[in-house]
Regions:
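Active-site beta->alpha loop and helix N-cap motifs at the rims of alpha/beta catalytic domains
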Residues: 2-8, 13-30, 34-38, 42-118, ...
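Catalytic alpha/beta core domains of metabolic enzymes, predominantly
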Residues: 110, 117, 124-215, 221-225
């Protein structure tokens, strides 16, 4: 489900993106799982550490129990290709709703293209993350082609933090992925509620938001007079 945009003149007739909740606090995930507006969930190692998660699998299995059949992303901790593959297969085995997050590069900047292609060919549902450019999107989309349903997460907020307009990058990413029906683009690392509107404007299918940003969405279209 989505929040309507018809109260905004600049967004009339646009299709709102699906909403994913971003976080690793289990009570918050449980609460948001009761909200019909939430279409899926994402987590990452930074959020896990912030939430004090010490047993990754126990946390993940508890989260899977409350989110039902909605997609939820769990990220690998590994930074070496063979270990990324091993961890990804392990995480994928935790449930049918699991999408395994794999960063687009390792910490030394090496592309994970081959890892992504191998996992996709093996039927692992992936959420390739931390992308910043349309070139990266094109490479990842090609690696995922022919595999199971997948997501590509572009860090639009970090693009904006670098002083660049994320809209052309997101629009180009949408165009690159248009031919791949099983691939969906995620507007990741949003900084404000207005990013929800911007995602709709460029045709981005999904936006993932932390609980504090999700709480602001009902004010979209509010009369400012």
């Amino acid at each position: 489900m989505t929040y309507p945009l018809d109260r905004l003149p600049q967004a009339g007739g646009l299709t709102p993106p699906q909403l994913f909740a971003d976080g690793a606090d289990l009570p918050t995930i449980s609460k948001l799982a009761e909200d019909p507006m939430i279409d899926g969930f994402t987590t990452n190692p930074t959020l896990l550490a912030k939430a004090g998660v010490s047993d990754y699998e126990a946390f993940a299995r508890s989260a899977l129990e409350v989110v039902g059949d909605r997609p939820i992303s769990f990220e690998v901790f590994a930074d070496e290709p063979a270990e990324i593959v091993r961890q990804a297969r392990l995480l994928a085995g935790w449930g049918d709703a699991v999408f395994v997050k794999v960063p687009v590069t390792t910490t030394d900047g090496t592309s994970t293209h081959d890892v992504v292609a191998e996992l996709a060919a093996d039927g692992v549902q992936l959420n390739v993350t931390a992308l910043m450019t349309p070139r990266q999107v094109a490479v990842v989309s090609a690696a995922l082609a022919g595999g199971p349903p997948s997501y590509i997460s572009v860090f639009a907020g970090r693009v904006a933090d670098a002083g660049r307009d994320p809209l052309p990058i997101m629009a180009a990413s949408v165009a690159i992925m248009a031919a791949e029906a099983d691939q969906r683009l995620i507007w990741a690392s949003p900084r404000e509620a207005y990013n929800y509107v911007q995602a709709a404007q460029v045709g981005c299918q999904v936006i993932t938001m932390t609980a504090d940003l999700l709480a602001k969405l009902p004010t979209i279209g509010k009369d400012l007079d």
